Amino acid sequence: MDAYEIIQYIGDAKKQTLVKVTLKGQLKEVTFPETIKVFNNCKTGTLFGDWADVKPFLEANKEKIEDYVVENDARNSAIPFLDLKDINARIEPGALIREKVEIGDQAVIMMGAILNIGAVVGAGTMIDMGAVLGGRATVGKHCHIGAGTVLAGVIEPPSAAPVVIENEVVIGANAVVLEGVRVGEGAVVAAGAVVVEDVPAHTVVAGVPAKVIKQIDDKTKSKTEILEELRKL
């Protein structure tokens, strides 16, 4: 998705405050609206719906509802989380992935990683623990994005270029790649680097701001090897 498509999608999306409600009472006597999904055994039940629908329902039936607990984790949210069930990748618990994210075959998304709308993860790429892919950040195939790394997102302003990480790139832990930067194929970004300009292919960059320190050699390749065993499903 380009920035304008994302902006249109967010702008047109119905903003919802989704809740889960566990309740008990004289539920056999209650009429549930069609806008609320209900699992009810007459004395106790569970509701799922938008707070805009659930709140007036609870207030209208307070004489028949003895008690309830509301669970909620967002307010006026426009973008749901991605449905992960049929994605051909390994996605660990605790990863936060918004709808409209693309994940390639045999990619690995570790716990705590955050992928915003429009982000792309190529086949066989690992996004390590706590890494953040901002809106429209694009990562190619067979890359490793280290723990705690941030690939800056660009949705607003829509004319700005996104971060692009080409194939077979390795980025160390806690690096930052700023908006509009392209990291060339086979490059290595050292841990803690702050990348503010494009990185040539097959080079190693390090520092703040990141600078080229050498060309990729056999020693570097051995230290940054991508292991297919970690990507098996």
From Swiss-Prot:
Pfam families: DapH_N (PF08503), Hexapep (PF00132), Hexapep_2 (PF14602)
Pathway: Amino-acid biosynthesis; L-lysine biosynthesis via DAP pathway; LL-2,6-diaminopimelate from (S)-tetrahydrodipicolinate (acetylase route): step 1/3
Keywords: Acyltransferase, Amino-acid biosynthesis, Diaminopimelate biosynthesis, Lysine biosynthesis, Repeat, Transferase
One of the protein's GO biological processes: lysine biosynthetic process via diaminopimelate
Gene (UniProt): dapH
EC number: 2.3.1.89
Protein name: 2,3,4,5-tetrahydropyridine-2,6-dicarboxylate N-acetyltransferase
Function in brief: Catalyzes the transfer of an acetyl group from acetyl-CoA to tetrahydrodipicolinate.
Record keyword Repeat present: yes
Annotated source species: Enterococcus faecalis (strain ATCC 700802 / V583)
Family: Belongs to the transferase hexapeptide repeat family. DapH subfamily.
